[in-house]
């Protein structure tokens, strides 16, 4: 029996039977049924029997009978233009019918169809830079991404939204923060939970990211849930953000500073307009139009990040011989076992730039307080202040390829990576 999206159906394959609403599928070879629980299930059409229980039980967005390409939002001269750049990740994911796992396979146009709430907020241009899960991110893709952002801004984009997997989003946001001088907002967003889950955060994050991209904050930032509720998203500076929870929707935090601002979802969900809705900005920020577009995307890939722990074998550091740079996550103020000092000194003598950060995250490195720290400074270690370890790695990759004096650059606040004063601890 023929069934259309929106029909309530019972699908039987083998000994299994599923009942729910048929929804549009990205493949003609598979059916997607939304169960009453809110989850989606994918079924191979080759061995499935379909019974229509209620025709047109619900209205399904995008069910026009036309090819998917016909769902593109029409251009409106009164609206800003936002470039949507997809790199993959959960926000652009669906069910892998081979395994039942979630796989990233939507391109930017699919995101528009999947999030109809984006319609009317802006004109959109979509492009795919990569289609990967973010654990497969590479520095070369950061360079491709920076080039794509530059091209979109040069073509007239009023803002850019980058769809990205959350696991390594902080690294990519840091990379573009160092690579780009941008006159418009560049907003990273993603989803902790895929679209087939009732608790998915993809729609709210995407809507808030587009509103942020229409705002006056011309920086690279991350837009994700600020709380577990669907109330507002936080805007985190790309060099001060860190994913601090594996699965919560509010997994991202600004560390050692306060967020650039917030996007109120209720306000953003009201009738779409050309102006940014629901965006409040807190503190100093680069304003739209202040900077002239420039890209410095060269990177030195031979940089390692090493976390010191008690009992760490000296061979782990010795294995970094030949690397252009090493960032160490030290304890407290920036310490390692005193037995490692000579190995670190040998790395420096051989031309490796060694940078010290703290695994404490809050506070800053100061190797002038204790003997161990002073010995590290004498060995040539560069203090990175309160730069986050992951950010320090990306910054060192960038500094070694672009700065006249990389060591000095690591002690300067490029793109807000290093604050001038750590926040006092408050309960």
UniProtKB/Swiss-Prot annotation:
Keyword annotations: ATP-binding, Ligase, Nucleotide-binding, Protein biosynthesis
Enzyme Commission code(s) on record: 6.3.5.-
SUPFAM superfamilies on file: GatD N-terminal domain-like, Glutaminase/Asparaginase
Enzyme class (EC, first level): ligase
PANTHER family named among the record's database cross-references: 60 KDA LYSOPHOSPHOLIPASE, L-ASPARAGINASE
Xref: HAMAP family: GatD
Family classification: Belongs to the asparaginase 1 family. GatD subfamily.
Name of the protein: Glutamyl-tRNA(Gln) amidotransferase subunit D
